[in-house]
């Protein structure tokens, strides 16, 4: 039990590395905010405070730290990492700089324990993933699956996905990079990203599964290219399979889209009651569906298309 006081109170604890511990503090008649952070042991930092990750063991160490609650650490790769077969890295809110390097995934989970599944489970508002290449494969049975993240509220910039992404869940949503992005505090920026990996599932987008913004603040996807084959049991698209208040600019789909319901070269479906803008985009692949197909987009909502091929 701690006596009431004003100002900052620092308490140093020593948890066991790799384990979650519970600490109970009693402060009568006091309202306070408690922040618990853990340091990454055995990891060097550069002059800017980035944790330098060059091995699979290093990656597992920073994953442990993030999972324990220190989710705003900044990370920079110093080497290619091969064979990551663990669970998704938990909710992350820092900057992950691939620094031109790659991570090769061998992730496979059929448990249906995850709503969001990817290298990262969730990317929060201030999270940035940049300059990263993803190789290998990822297989899951989750609501939203993407090679980089199941859910993204942050930014993904200048990244490449070469991994095959497969989601076995019926009604699941899958993207080459992101399963779902939801606009929270500011426009989501997905820019300068290229997908070369095959994407398979029920609702499938080459770049993003479900992309959502607000009427006054659209989510933004810019300068992205899809070269990976899209195989969808339900809806499929080259860039976004389901869009809601989103803007897609300077994006290109170069591959074939195969779906059983709605298929679009850029957007599969614009949701009813929402809007989408597609500007300076091109579809160079064939779009095949048993029901509805369009070179640019199919829609139940309002759509603006400018300078598209």
Say what each PLM segment does.
Residues 17-41:
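Conserved "repeat-terminator" motif of extracellular CCP/Sushi domains
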Residues 39-309:
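Surface-exposed repetitive/solenoidal architectures
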């Amino acid at each position: 039990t701690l006596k009431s006081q004003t100002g900052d109170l620092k308490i140093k604890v020593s948890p066991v590395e790799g384990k979650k511990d519970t600490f109970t503090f009693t402060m009568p008649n006091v309202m306070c905010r408690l922040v618990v952070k853990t340091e990454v042991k055995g990891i060097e930092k550069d002059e800017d405070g980035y944790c330098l990750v060059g091995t699979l063991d290093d990656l597992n160490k920073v994953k442990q730290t993030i999972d324990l609650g220190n989710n705003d650490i900044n990370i920079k790769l110093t080497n290619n990492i091969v064979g990551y077969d663990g669970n998704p890295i938990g909710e992350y809110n820092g900057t992950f700089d691939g620094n031109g390097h790659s991570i090769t995934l061998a992730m496979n989970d059929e448990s249906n324990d995850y709503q969001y599944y990817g290298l990262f489970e969730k990317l929060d508002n201030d999270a940035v993933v940049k300059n990263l290449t993803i190789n290998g494969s990822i297989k899951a049975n989750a609501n939203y699956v993407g090679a980089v993240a199941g859910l993204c509220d942050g930014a993904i910039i200048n990244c490449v996905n070469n991994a095959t992404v497969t989601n076995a869940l019926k009604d699941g949503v899958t993207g080459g990079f992101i399963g779902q992005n939801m606009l929270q505090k500011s426009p989501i920026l997905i820019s300068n990203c290229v997908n070369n990996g095959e994407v398979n599932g029920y609702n499938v987008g080459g770049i993003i599964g479900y992309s959502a913004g607000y009427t006054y603040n659209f989510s933004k996807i810019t300068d992205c290219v899809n070269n990976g084959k899209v195989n969808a049991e339900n809806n499929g698209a080259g860039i976004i399979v389901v869009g809601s208040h989103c803007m897609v600019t300077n994006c290109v789909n170069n591959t074939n889209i195969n779906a059983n319901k709605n298929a679009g070269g850029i957007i599969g479906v614009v949701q009813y009651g929402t809007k989408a803008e597609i500007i300076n985009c091109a579809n160079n692949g064939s779009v095949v569906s048993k029901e509805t197909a369009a070179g640019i987009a199919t829609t139940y909502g309002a759509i603006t298309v400018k300078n598209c091929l």
